[in-house]
Amino acid sequence: MQRGEIWFAATPGGDRPVLVLTRDPVADRIGNVVVAALTRTVRGLVSELSLTPAEDGVPTECVVSFDNIHTVARTSLRHRVTTLSPARMARACRALDDALGC
């Protein structure tokens, strides 16, 4: 698993898509990874990153919500969907910075 990959993670409410944020050198070595949730609910916030099937390989138009960051067990990641391009990850980092405000 690598930073920038989108996976379906097993949650109590069913499988949900997430973007892996944990840095590459440790993502495969630790038990938990930091992820940001994907959602089809667009709020128009600077802390969101819009994704499309054509540009990003996601099944449907959605946003990564950097206001919804959490840690999940690495073993809960079930199925890799796609990997964001370096340019999209650069935008993701800007949205994450906006969300955290630091």
Functional labels for PLM-detected ranges:
Residues 1-102:
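Conserved functional hotspots at enzyme active or ligand-binding sites that engage polyanionic ligands
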